[in-house]
Amino acid sequence: MKRLKFGLIPALLLLLAACSNDSPAMVKVSLAPVPYSIEVPAEIAEHLSIENMVTSTPSEFTNQAREAGAIAQVYINYKAADGTMHGFAGVYYFKKADYEKAQNPNEPPVYGSKVVEENSMVVLIQGPQDSMFDPNSQDGKNSAALYTLVYNPKSFKSS
């Protein structure tokens, strides 16, 4: 029986190690000033940058969001293999009550889809409607994977 245990344990450890190597290394990308990070594969994270909408690119829309109660607003930007930068998604952080007040039930959500709700606060994603890259290219595959991640609440971790 002891031989079986000692022979089985190393085999199970090798199997576990082999399985864990199949999944990509995940990296936390801070969304500050939104108090969350998003976990993405390392090979996608190297293409991402976070831009504070209010300080970097203020606009009439960012002012409207702030007046509606947005506490923080950031862009997730994606740098393609050819070096061009593309706005991928907007991330908005609201008190739940302010978010609900800003919504018109007869229209699409102004600030995107609610992805995280925690402690009377919400994280909203206003993401791409369509891929900006050839779906067969590496950028297209990264974009599709990132799209799935930004709409998955489990991808977000409170900072």
Locations of the language-model features?
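C-terminal motif of bacterial Sec signal peptides marking the signal peptidase cleavage site
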Residues: 15-18
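Bacterial signal peptide processing site
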Residues: 20-22
